[in-house]
Amino acid sequence: MKLTEKETEILEILDENSRADLETIAKMAGIPVNEVKTIIDKLEKEKVIIDYSAMIDWRKVDGHEGVTAMIDVKVTPKRGVGFDEVAERIYRFQEVESVYLMSGVYDLSVVIRGNSMSDVARFVSDKLSTLDSVVSTTTHFILKKYKHDGKVFETGDDDKRIVVSP
């Protein structure tokens, strides 16, 4: 889909701050509010804008720490559908946050969230590994997030260590 300059500008504004209201977007883009609304409605209808979401730092919420894992998956593609069929089966699991087709040693990269490492292990052994097309998996646990989707989680400004000088 070919976009106009203003449509692209509005997408860039929303990509940076999905909470921006119509008036703010109109001022930033230099167009009337009703035109912004028309453009956004069109982009939503065409599924260019898929969703608006918040980015949560779950480590700061008691009882919601959880575990995130990236799983590299080797699969045997099926004739006529390639990797799409197995990717769809994988992304339908509730635990799965993202699925990517990759170049390199592994075919798919799967990001999942669980309450514990045991939950992730059960997902891999009971659900993922048992799929017909899956040949092998390698699981990597996320130990700490520094930056995600362009947003920095920790700046290091609150370093509480004591300064030691000679």
Curated annotation (Swiss-Prot):
Report domain HTH asnC-type positions. 3-65
Q: Which GO terms describe its molecular function?
A: sequence-specific DNA binding
**Keyword list, A-Z:** DNA-binding, Transcription, Transcription regulation
Q: From the UniProt annotation, which stretches of this protein bind DNA? A: 22-41
UniProt-recorded name of the protein = Uncharacterized HTH-type transcriptional regulator YugG
What is the organism of origin for this protein?
Bacillus subtilis (strain 168)
Give the gene symbol: yugG
